[in-house]
């Protein structure tokens, strides 16, 4: 009995430390994702508008576009990792540090002129997919730590749906379907790049819903570490 009481007291203290004295579950991780996603989409819109200005502008704006995509992927990791590992600081710090380092490496690689050329579109898609798939490790770890919580199962299902949307978008981006089947027919509406962007938006919205599920779950259990220990 005494051991259980000590464990609960330690759990409560850990939760209070994470919450900064019990002022509610932090919202800033969700804001990180929102800012990252909106920044990425704003850069992408600017690149599509101005990249045709000159050859130099094309190179610069598409490099910024690739950096924005990498930043959005990194930002997407922040809320689910933060909320899933709210009471497991070492794991939280390790996973967020790892994806940040991976994002920096990918940006560094894609800012090199050869990798930003059109002929390396498959490599770029592969790098972005690799960044996303690296989330499988923290997802499985979080599932193990929070086994038995229906909200975690729902959030994971939504994240899988998000991954499928992004993967499908990457496939359209690389394959250039359907315009390669009917050249000229989809020049204005319905070409692969438009489908790619629609699927990115679908994935981002799905991810936001998953984050909201995790945040509400943390609120309902008062972010108590004992609820996930």
Swiss-Prot record:
Offer one example of a GO biological process linked to this entry: response to sucrose
Its keywords, alphabetically, are:
Membrane, Stress response, Transmembrane, Transmembrane helix
Per its record, what are the GO molecular function terms?
A: signaling receptor activity
Keyword Membrane carried by entry = yes
The portions of this protein that span the membrane are 5-25, 31-51, 67-87, 93-113, 125-145, 154-174, 195-215
InterPro entries annotated for this entry?
AdipoR/HlyIII-related (IPR004254)
Q: Which residues are on the Extracellular side of the membrane?
A: 26-30, 88-92, 146-153, 216-229
The reply on keyword GTP-binding is: no
Q: Which GO terms describe its cellular component?
A: membrane
Pfam families under this entry?
HlyIII
Bilayer topology annotation:
Multi-pass membrane protein
Write out the topological domains of type Cytoplasmic.
1-4, 52-66, 114-124, 175-194
Q: Which domain of life is it from?
A: Eukaryota
The protein's predominant localisation is membrane
- Places the protein is found: Membrane
Function statement: May play a role in abiotic stress response.
What does the similarity note say?
Belongs to the ADIPOR family.
Q: Which protein are we looking at?
A: Heptahelical transmembrane protein ADIPOR2
Q: Organism, per UniProt? A: Oryza sativa subsp. japonica
Its taxonomic path starts at:
Eukaryota, Viridiplantae, Streptophyta, Embryophyta, Tracheophyta
